[in-house]
Amino acid sequence: MFENLSSKIEKALHTLRGKGSITDINVAETVKEVRKALLDADVSYPIAKEFTDKVKAEAMGRNVIQSIEPGQLMVKIVHEKLTELMGSSAVDINIKGNPAVILIAGLQGSGKTTFSAKLAYHLKNKRAKNVMLVAGDIYRPAAISQLQTLGQQIQVPVYTEEGNNNPVKIAHNAIAEARQKGVNVVIVDTAGRLAVDEDMMNEISALKRELQPQETLFVVDSMTGQDAVNTAKAFNDRIDYDGVVLTKLDGDTRGGAALTIRYTVEKPIKFVGVGEKMDALDVFHPDRMANRILGMGDVVSLVERAQEQYDEAEARKIQKKLIHNEYNFEDFLSQIAQIKKMGSMKDLVGMIPGMDKLTKNVEISDDAFKPIEAIIGSMTPYERRNPQCLNGSRKQRIAAGSGRSIQELNRFLKQFDDTRKMMKMVSKGNTKMPIRKRR
């Protein structure tokens, strides 16, 4: 996420490291490089210039405390201004209503239908809401079919009306049914177009006027950069939406849309899509995003994800097994499954401070666990539960079954043993596991 932008800003700020003081010359040099980094990220020139002018004015107006290097001070100032540019703080969606209606708008291909399902999953599992999805795209049968498939996947009902070509009536009927069934939140997916056109704008305007939704969200593909910003402005001018959703952020190396949409349309970014899975949706926190852009990671989000997947009973069971030397390959496989539920490996690594530098030339892939899973999958149930039983002949069979060499198998067994020893030390040193579920 934002790899190009991060590396260029970091390089720009590096020019102040080792300097004894802040001067007009070194600040001007740093600010110039930051501006170039923003322009390369597809940030418009007026916004990039205003941003760097603010950074420069702030830097020249501060006295450097003796214990703080000029480089550190500049990082702090850039972090503050990035956070401010993206909205300062997270803004929640309004789900107060009987039921609350959320209208989803955006161009075709922006990820609107997938986001609708992700939002339903988010509200159902993280906010304990009873949710209904409404298939309001009457022009594309594939969109209705996609929403029904996603609804089944996340176990959320999808309201459809075959033969009804009036999206306003479909939505009204869905809301009436939702009210009867005690549904808390109705999410209305709407038709998109390949480009902004008058018919589309008239339809989405009519839906907003007739439904009076508690929340209208505009969904845009972050990878389209400045085009995303222009489209966001065109929609906002017509329907005055409440917030923006940036999809495909995990594949965006530049970050121009994330940096400038809020400034341009004066509406907050509320959610970001960070993967294909239904739980790959994050509430947008400007300060955390600024951390990631500056290579400082996002430990808070990492801990939150860990807490969501954390099973206290399972953790206590594993802790007990570690103390009694009973930790086995089945337990290891179970923990891998928990890690995979937290998100893509690339995204998780990006949340750890400093890891972006260490893994700069390393290919981070979700396939990293596949060799381990293949090795453990080639063991018998007895072998998975009893690691100490693996003799030469068993190893030969497991290696052949998993398609790995004996050397690779032995390397994994050593890593497993080292991991088990380390976890045992941690477990003995703490009577409680390090992460506890929030109450």
Task: Give the predicted meaning of each segment.
Residues F2-K19, R288-R439:
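Long amphipathic alpha-helical segments used for membrane anchoring, targeting, substrate engagement
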Residues I9-G136, A143-N164, A171-T190:
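Primarily NTPase-proximal linker/entry elements flanking Walker-type ATP/GTP-binding cores
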Residues E29, E33, E50, K54, ...:
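Amphipathic alpha-helical interaction segments
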Residues A171-I175, R179, V183, A195, ...:
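Conserved phosphate-handling catalytic cores of large alpha/beta enzymes
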Residues V101-L103, M132-L133, Y159, I187, ...:
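Structured core elements
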Residues S110, Y139-P141, N165-P167, G192-V196, ...:
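Short, small-residue-enriched loops and turns at beta-alpha junctions
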Residues L16, D42, V78, L107, ...:
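Residue-level signature of catalytic and energy-coupling elements of molecular machines
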